[in-house]
A protein has these predicted regions:
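Domain-level signature for soluble enzymes in the chorismate/prephenate branch of the shikimate pathway
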Residues: 1-323
Length: 323
């Protein structure tokens, strides 16, 4: 057109201006009122806490990485163990546990899609998080010799995180429900040609000998665990926001949404697409942002997006702990 090379730039600026104008109109018309009400009611004066007599839930058995993260997030709080991630959600849903601790992302293996799928299925919220350094070791029965080991049992994420070690030494990786459960299985088995990939904590707990330490592909191997809750709670020190949404099938629609976060002064720390699984090329986006809903600009934007974007879900605003 007449604008020449600058046409696209002008179009982008114009679109952004229109979006900003729409957001302002949206607030004046009390848009996103339901989300605003829900978020306002969830604001707390202090950190999230577990009442006396309540417990938290995680998958696996004692020594599982989730239980290590849980014990650091909620010191001294009893932990109930369940076999699978979904059992953790069921426990929280039924009130058997106040919160659940589940992994959502690993620095080597990526997002734990099952966790996000379950958060959507149960319509739960993230109310806390912890970024945990994961140190895997190879552990076996005290009577097992290293040269006799052929098969290694562990959770599929742990096998992925230690794939170089497994391939280099010609081991066969066998998927098990959980790293600590794999350690327990190896400890109780009569076989002397198997080992487990687990935490040093789990190896010690089940009386296994540690044959090799730090066998993960990347030395700084980290997993993010989130605290899941049936109801929305936003602690006073919350600094991270998680969202899921879809965008319309129009050119630049995702770019425009991301531009609005930028205009609101929000820093994206994660964006990931996930097929919706309906046979069409439709995608959900997981987005993490540094920020707090206590800031008006942030809350206004989330309320506007909740009305505009299909499949929008505010997953929570929480504090993330690190080592």
């Amino acid at each position: 057109g007449k604008c020449g090379d600058r046409g696209e730039t002008i179009k982008t600026v114009f679109a952004a201006t229109m979006d900003a104008s729409r957001a302002l109109q949206h607030k004046m018309m009390d848009g996103g009122a339901d989300l605003r009400k829900e978020i306002t009611a969830a604001l707390q004066d202090g950190p999230i806490a577990v009442a006396p007599g309540e417990c938290i839930a995680c998958a696996g058995v004692e020594g599982a990485y989730a239980s290590i993260a849980g014990a650091r997030l909620f010191p001294g709080v009893p932990i109930k163990y369940y076999k699978y991630f979904e059992n953790v959600f069921e426990a929280v849903d039924k009130g058997e546990a106040r919160y659940g601790i589940i992994p959502v992302e690993n620095s080597t293996a990526g997002s734990v899609h099952e966790s996000y799928d379950l958060i959507m299925k149960y319509r739960f919220f993230m109310v806390g998080a912890r970024d945990e350094k994961i140190e895997h070791c190879l552990a076996a029965h005290p009577d097992t010799r290293y040269e006799d080991v052929e098969s290694i049992y562990s959770h599929h994420q742990a096998l992925t995180q230690c794939s170089n070690f497994i391939e280099n030494f010609g081991f066969t990786g066998i998927t098990y429900s959980n790293t600590a459960a794999a350690a327990k299985y190896v400890a109780q088995s009569d076989r002397r040609d198997i080992a487990a990939i687990c935490s040093p904590t789990a190896a010690k707990k089940y009386g296994l000998q540690v044959m090799k330490r730090e066998i993960q592909n990347i030395s700084n191997n980290r997993t993010r665990f989130v605290v899941i809750s049936k109801d929305m709670q936003i602690s006073s020190d919350a600094d991270k926001i998680s969202l899921i949404f879809r965008v319309p099938h129009t050119t630049g629609s995702l770019y425009r949404v991301l531009g609005r976060f930028s205009m609101a002064g929000l820093n994206l720390t994660k964006i990931e697409s996930r097929p919706m699984g309906n046979g069409e090329f439709s995608y959900f986006f997981y987005v993490d942002i540094m920020g707090s809903v206590r800031r008006d600009v942030t809350l206004d934007l989330l309320c506007a997006l909740s009305d505009e974007l299909p499949g929008f879900k505010f997953l929570g605003n929480f504090r993330e702990q690190e080592d």
